[in-house]
From Swiss-Prot:
Spans traversing the lipid bilayer: 4-24, 49-69, 74-94, 109-129, 151-171, 179-199, 203-223, 228-248, 254-274, 303-323
Cofactor: Mg(2+)
UniProt-annotated location(s): Cell membrane
Example GO biological process: regulation of cell shape
Recorded family membership: Belongs to the glycosyltransferase 4 family. MraY subfamily.
Protein name per the record: Phospho-N-acetylmuramoyl-pentapeptide-transferase
Major location (coarse): membrane
PROSITE patterns: MRAY_1, MRAY_2
EC number: 2.7.8.13
Length: 326
């Protein structure tokens, strides 16, 4: 248990040290964020804010994780975060440095995400002995130990790939306001610590603590008005690490509850696109969901803090779903 909070503290400290060192370099290299012209007008003043700042908390997370985690399951969570972060880094680099506004082509990004998710599924089943079952949240209220559905290898592979790709991109969509993705992800990661401990995966718990510490440190530079944005480098890394923890601990469905904000953000985009293409009407003022509230007159900080509070509610609901599952 001690290593868990040491990982959190080391990650927090390294992130706080790295921020003032990295941000001026990003600014000097002119790694500035471009802002959508069709977005909220007050966002236009953010143009030029350094992006790719995810490398700041990834440095902290890696320091806290690799120094203290010795188990393969904890290391695989860190490697998934770094792997997805590398995809995001390539995307950011192409957009910011090579000036190709769309970054990586969609099929290129998707291919990388699918391959990493498939590798995670293979490792979890054939190397970590996870099996191919998924646990139903709240089923512990019905029977001690809960109810587990064994999918078999191929359905489990498809389920894992869909989950990881969907949720990692949902985290990416959540990164649209100062402090939103970092704050939500910190709370989700902290909620996954007891989930991992309940699954007897102390290494994963330490990995989640390190990720949470990195997010907290990053908030010192990313809360409104942000001095730096995490970019796809950071948001995809968060998604990859959180999803890996959920898969290894058999808590995929719990993760959909705990990460409810991510799900709502992604669904708002899907609903908006389907509605506009089929009826010509928009359900939301703008998607993802956080922009809907912004255009409704909410301040940026009000939206962010409200979404943090909702994450606490989702986390409490998810943790309640652990009852008698172990």
């Amino acid at each position: 248990m001690g290593n868990i909070w040491v990982a959190f503290t080391v990650s927090l400290a390294v992130t706080l040290i790295a921020g003032p060192l990295v941000i001026p370099v990003l600014r000097r290299l002119k790694f500035g964020q471009s802002i959508r012209s069709d977005g909220p007008s007050r966002h236009l003043q953010k143009a030029g804010t350094p992006t790719m700042g995810g490398i700041i908390f990834l440095a902290g997370t890696a320091a806290g994780g690799f120094l203290l985690i010795r188990s393969a399951d904890g290391l695989i969570v860190l490697l998934m975060a770094l792997g997805y972060g590398f995809i995001g880094f390539l995307d950011d680099y192409i957009k910011v440095v090579l000036k190709r506004s769309l970054g990586l082509r969609a099929r290129e990004k998707l291919l990388g995400q699918v391959l990493l998710a498939a590798a995670l599924a293979y490792w979890a089943v054939f190397e970590a002995g996870r099996g191919t079952g998924i646990v139903l949240p709240f089923s512990g209220f019905l029977t001690p130990g809960g109810i587990q559905m064994d999918l078999g290898w191929w359905p489990f592979l498809a389920f894992t790939v869909l989950l990881v790709v969907f949720m990692s991109n949902a985290v990416n969509l959540t990164d649209g306001l100062d402090g939103l993705a970092a704050g939500v992800s910190m709370l989700v990661a902290l909620a996954l610590v007891p989930v991992a401990l309940a699954a007897d995966r102390a290494g994963v718990a330490a990995g989640m603590a390190a990720l949470a510490g990195g997010c907290l440190g990053f908030l010192f530079f990313n809360f409104h008005p942000a001095k730096v944005f995490m970019g796809d480098t950071g948001s995809l890394a968060l998604g990859g690490g959180l999803c890996a923890a959920a898969v290894v601990t058999k808590s995929e469905l719990l993760f959909l509850i705990i990460g409810g904000i991510y799900v709502l953000e992604a669904l708002s985009v899907i609903i908006q696109v389907i509605s506009f293409q089929t009826t010509g009407r928009r359900v939301f003022r703008m998607s993802p969901l956080h922009h809907h509230f912004e255009l409704g007159g909410w301040s940026e900080n009000r939206v962010v803090i409200t979404f943090w509070a909702l994450t606490l509610v989702f986390a409490a609901a998810g943790l309640a779903g652990l009852y008698r599952l172990v």
